[in-house]
Amino acid sequence: MSEEQLLAYTSADPFAQTSSKPWEYEATSPYLRKVAIIWIILVMAAHLFMGFTVGLSFTGATVTTIDKFAFPGVGVVISILSWLALTRPRLRANSDGVEIRNILGTRFYPWQVIYGLSFPEGSRMARIELPDFEYVPVWALQSGDKQNVITKVRSFRDLEARYMPQDD
């Protein structure tokens, strides 16, 4: 398969390739985990408060016991979904390529289609540069991780130097 065919094939089908080799690099964001914890505390506090106060005074509407438990129940559902979404992002790499798992999807890119990792100044997260000026945000590398993200980016760039094809 030529490089052009590989590029077209990988771009057209998100499940076109994957790697069976062991991963040499893996990164997640401790900052997003902290954001998730704070968000869940706020969501649950608001929903517990609403569940407690919904029936305190008579407003003309009938408020049943189930209504009082519905607010915290909705808060639990929102909290679980938030936790799953914010702790999901991950970046993995090996000699075959890079796997990016963001909030909504996972995608594998072979080294042949990657132009590098960049972290634009003022940006909240890094991104993988792709052909035709496209890029994929990498939620696993957040600027909120401060010194930790610098170490992770340097480690990733070491793999880039080892596996990315050289320009002709």
Write out the residue ranges for each language-model feature.
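Residues at secondary-structure transition points
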Residues: T64-D67, Q147
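Acidic/histidine-enriched, beta-strand-rich ligand/metal-binding domains
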Residues: L32, R90-N94, R101-G105, F119, ...
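Conserved beta-hairpin
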Residues: V74-P110
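Single-pass alpha-helical transmembrane signal-anchor segments
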Residues: W39-F49, A70-A85
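Short secondary-structure junctions
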Residues: Y25, G116-L117, Q166
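N-terminal membrane-targeting/pre-transmembrane regions
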Residues: M1-V63
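A membrane-cytosol interface segment of integral membrane proteins
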Residues: E129-D168
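Acidic, Ser/Thr-rich low-complexity segments on the non-lumenal side of membrane proteins
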Residues: R92, R107-G144
